[in-house]
């Protein structure tokens, strides 16, 4: 996060520890996410924080989950998924042409070796002007960027891992 006060983490951290987990407050470098990057009603600048996960987390595999997700079962098996040489795994979006960036299983080592953060930042800087000029229909912030950078390099996860109840019917009408 960029600006959540440390006090906010006390109670959730205690709850996580009671369940055998932990909650770690990682502060992003203010220079990572640019204030000029595209935001929308449903996309804050913090959405772009996903680009920098490998910079701050050292584990070989990382599971990113959007804050609005409801987890209904143990996620341990997710870390056993064979990534088959893909830097990320995600769920196909409701348009059946792209993936949704709300659930990302990241091969951290591969991401780092292939400088994916740099590719995402460069693509963001390059596409934002086009989006502002209206040259990219249905531009959806970081999700559009993720899909461009990883277009043929992602593994599809079971749709139950990011089921969008109701949204699947109305999203692209």
Regions found by a protein language model. Give the residues of each.
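Catalytic core and acceptor-binding pocket of nucleotide-sugar-dependent glycosyltransferases
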Residues: 94-173
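Short, glycine/charged-enriched secondary-structure capping and boundary segments
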Residues: 11-13, 77-80, 119
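Residues at alpha-helix caps and immediate loop-helix transition turns in enzyme cores, especially N-
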Residues: 7-11, 74, 142
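Active-site-proximal specificity loops/subdomain of glycosyltransferases
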Residues: 5-56
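Alpha-helix N-cap/loop-to-helix initiation residues
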Residues: 4-5, 71
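Short internal beta-strands
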Residues: 1-3, 90
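GT-A fold catalytic core of metal-dependent nucleotide-sugar glycosyltransferases
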Residues: 25-29, 46-114
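Short, intrinsically disordered, charge-balanced linker/junction segments flanking boundaries
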Residues: 16-24, 89, 167-173
């Amino acid at each position: 996060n960029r600006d959540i006060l440390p006090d906010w983490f006390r109670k959730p951290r205690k709850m996580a520890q009671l369940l055998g987990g932990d909650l770690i407050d990682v502060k992003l470098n203010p220079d990572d996410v640019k204030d000029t990057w595209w935001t929308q009603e449903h996309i804050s600048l913090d959405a772009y924080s996903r680009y920098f996960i490998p910079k701050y987390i050292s584990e070989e595999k990382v599971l990113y989950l959007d804050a609005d997700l409801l987890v209904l079962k143990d996620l341990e098996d997710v870390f056993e998924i064979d990534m088959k040489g893909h830097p990320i795994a995600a769920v196909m979006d409701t348009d059946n042409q792209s993936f949704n960036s709300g659930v990302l299983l990241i091969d951290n080592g591969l991401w780092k070796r292939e400088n994916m953060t740099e590719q995402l930042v460069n693509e963001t800087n390059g596409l934002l002007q086009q989006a502002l000029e209206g040259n990219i229909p249905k531009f959806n912030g970081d999700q559009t960027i993720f899909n461009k950078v990883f277009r043929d390099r992602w593994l599809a996860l079971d749709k139950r891992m990011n089921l969008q109840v109701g949204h699947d019917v109305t999203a692209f009408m």
